[in-house]
């Protein structure tokens, strides 16, 4: 006489490219190395590994990541150094609707340097993507902590939200919305 019935564990319907949100960090792969954009090296607070082949995200996100990294590499832009509290580039936050294919791009920087981001916007919009970029934002974050937060958000293109459908329900997803990062697994 059990109060519940155990159905077991169900896997995600897709194994790769399932995340609808990723936060990438700017940094260097080793001390004084070239600019990198990706994820923290295992066991390291400071070293950032380029993630040109991250299996967690849709290939659209990878194309955007590479475009953004190359744009700032060409301009020799600095990344934010947490201990010294100096530098410009902090994070790249990407959101992509699994059902809609709509994409939000958020470049998070400090105010310590200034760059014309219009050429970046044009390069991003010209990328051959499966989905569609519906918004590009420049988020200003001058806080000392290493979190993605907004002191100010500038919309460079489009809108700051997209819609996602989950179990027949329509959700409006914005930059800082809390939403299941694996939409399809939530439907299982």
Residue ranges and their predicted role:
Residues 1-188:
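Accessory RNA-recognition modules of RNA-modification enzymes
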């Amino acid at each position: 006489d059990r109060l519940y019935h155990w159905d077991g564990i169900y896997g995600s319907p897709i194994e790769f490219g399932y995340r609808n949100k990723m936060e990438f960090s700017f940094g260097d792969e080793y001390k004084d190395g070239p600019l990198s954009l990706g994820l923290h090296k295992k066991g390291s607070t400071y070293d950032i590994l380029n993630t040109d082949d991250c299996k967690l995200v849709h290939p659209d996100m990878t194309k955007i990541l590479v475009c953004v990294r190359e744009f700032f590499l060409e301009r020799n832009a600095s990344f934010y150094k947490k201990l010294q509290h100096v530098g410009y580039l902090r994070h790249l936050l990407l959101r992509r609707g699994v059902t809609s294919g709509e994409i939000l791009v958020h470049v998070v920087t400090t105010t310590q340097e200034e760059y014309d981001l219009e050429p970046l916007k044009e390069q991003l919009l010209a990328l051959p993507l499966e989905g569609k970029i519906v918004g590009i934002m420049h988020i200003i974050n001058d806080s000392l902590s290493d979190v993605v937060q907004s002191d100010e958000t500038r919309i460079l293109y489009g809108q700051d939200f997209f819609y996602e459908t989950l179990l027949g329900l329509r959700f409006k997803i914005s930059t800082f919305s809390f939403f299941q990062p694996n939409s399809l697994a939530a439907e299982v």
